[in-house]
């Protein structure tokens, strides 16, 4: 958490406020944040009212309570590169969104291990993703390529993200889906803007995972779950549509 906070306070863009909602952590996270509060006026700790909501709804609860023209999600063990906020705001301004138009910027990132050794200099390249090829509602619903810790979005995007559907799997997937469905503007920064720690069991993106070593039963179960999610959000109308989309995306990624 200290590395994350230090990277935040090392940003070239400084006009921001950090809102924190602790979701029942049992370590010394809050005490560390409180120590930073003594030196920095722009940290606000939100009362969790004794509720443990899980990662998804913890982010959404915090988002709902904060009023701001722009929002960014931040994970406690990632490291932001110094120009991250500055570069994303510049990219957002180029979208020319008015107050009635939801807008979103997402970026590439570097995958690192727990000691910040680089595992992949480009997350997008490692998963065979290009925003020049994939940048639509159905593709986001399928791939989940917009990662929460790289997102910057406006107040209108926040407003249309509520209420939250029960079928939504994660905050980043859901907010991005809502923006696409509302015909909002989505842009990106191609260069990595942060270091994302890859732990043993964590997953970046909702369906970005290797199928190697999985038996047919497991694969079919995962496909069924993904299809149902995409049907619920309106990305596909039938299992046949889902299979066609899956094949199209698979073939496109071979050339990236």
Regions found by a protein language model. Give the residues of each.
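Nucleotide-sugar donor-binding/catalytic module of glycosyltransferases
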Residues: 1-209
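General helical structural elements
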Residues: 25, 223, 250-252
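Intrinsic low-complexity, intrinsically disordered segments enriched in polar/basic residues
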Residues: 53, 63, 115, 214-217, ...
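Enrichment for repetitive, rod-forming helical segments
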Residues: 91, 226, 233, 253-255
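Catalytic core of nucleotide-sugar-dependent glycosyltransferases
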Residues: 130-131, 196-239
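Membrane-interface aromatic/basic loop that binds lipid-linked glycans or pyrophosphate carriers
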Residues: 235-256
């Amino acid at each position: 958490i200290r590395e994350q906070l230090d990277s935040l306070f090392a940003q070239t863009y400084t006009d921001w406020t950090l809102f924190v909602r602790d979701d029942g952590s049992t370590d010394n996270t809050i005490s560390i944040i409180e120590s930073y509060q003594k030196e920095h006026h722009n940290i606000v700790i939100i009362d969790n009212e004794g509720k443990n909501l899980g990662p998804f709804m913890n982010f959404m609860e915090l988002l709902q309570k904060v009023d701001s023209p722009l929002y960014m999600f931040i994970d406690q063990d990632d490291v932001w590169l110094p120009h991250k906020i500055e570069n994303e705001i510049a990219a957002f301004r180029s979208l020319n969104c008015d107050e009635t138009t939801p807008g979103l910027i997402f970026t590439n990132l570097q995958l690192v291990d727990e000691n910040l050794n680089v595992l992949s200099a480009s997350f997008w390249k490692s998963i065979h993703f290009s925003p020049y090829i994939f940048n639509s509602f159905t593709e986001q619903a399928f791939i989940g390529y917009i990662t929460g810790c790289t997102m910057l979005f406006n107040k209108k995007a926040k407003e249309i993200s509520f209420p939250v559907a029960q079928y939504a799997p994660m905050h980043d997937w859901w907010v991005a889906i809502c923006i696409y469905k509302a015909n909002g503007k989505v842009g990106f920064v191609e260069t990595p803007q942060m270091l994302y720690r890859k732990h043993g069991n964590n997953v970046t993106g909702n369906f970005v995972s290797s199928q190697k070593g999985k038996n047919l039963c497991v694969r079919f179960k995962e496909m069924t779950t993904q299809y149902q999610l995409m049907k619920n959000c309106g990305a596909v109308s039938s299992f046949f549509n889902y299979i066609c989309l899956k094949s199209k995306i698979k073939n496109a990624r071979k050339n990236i």
